Amino acid sequence: MSETFDVDVLVHATHRASPFHDKAKTLVERFLAGPGLVYLLWPVALGYLRVVTHPTLLGAPLAPEVAVENIEQFTSRPHVRQVGEANGFWPVYRRVADPVKPRGNLVPDAHLVALMRHHGIATIWSHDRDFRKFEGIRIRDPFSG
């Protein structure tokens, strides 16, 4: 089964004050351990860097080099594929976005779903309920229940 994760999972795994920290950290450790195929979407990696280094979003932002090292834990694993837009992405995005008509904060979610479809990724781990607006993907909430 091919799977990926949203920015929130990485942020909660890093942010020790988060009520979801333990669950997120356990999930990230499972992804890092392998051997199952995991996809790191470039917008997720960059979104993580944006959030965890921002001086006002978290109580104690990470130094940029620490945040980059966290991402490199994924990029150094042979079972983790790093993917982004490729030729033919725009028509895939349109097929994902047109039925939902995303605006505002839903646009990045449509972007991730289009990347998933473009690369054949079936499942995304996220607490973001907006992913339910898109058909054809499986959403796993690591923090429910």
From Swiss-Prot:
Cofactor annotation: Mg(2+)
Keyword Transcription recorded:
no
Kindly list the positions annotated as binding Mg(2+).
Answer: D6, D109
On the tree of life, the source organism's domain of life is: Bacteria
Signal peptide region: none
Give the main EC class. Answer: hydrolase
InterPro entries documented for this protein: Mtu_PIN, PIN-like_dom_sf, PIN_dom, VapC_family
Q: Name one GO biological process term.
A: negative regulation of growth
List each copy of the PINc domain by range: 15-141
Which GO terms label this protein's molecular function in UniProt?
magnesium ion binding; RNA nuclease activity
**E.C. number, please?**
3.1.-.-
The alphabetical list of record keywords is:
Hydrolase, Magnesium, Metal-binding, Nuclease, Toxin-antitoxin system
Tell me the function of this protein.
Answer: Toxic component of a type II toxin-antitoxin (TA) system. An RNase. Its cognate antitoxin is VapB48.
**Family affiliation:** Belongs to the PINc/VapC protein family.
This chain belongs to the protein called: Ribonuclease VapC48
Biological source species: Mycobacterium tuberculosis (strain CDC 1551 / Oshkosh)
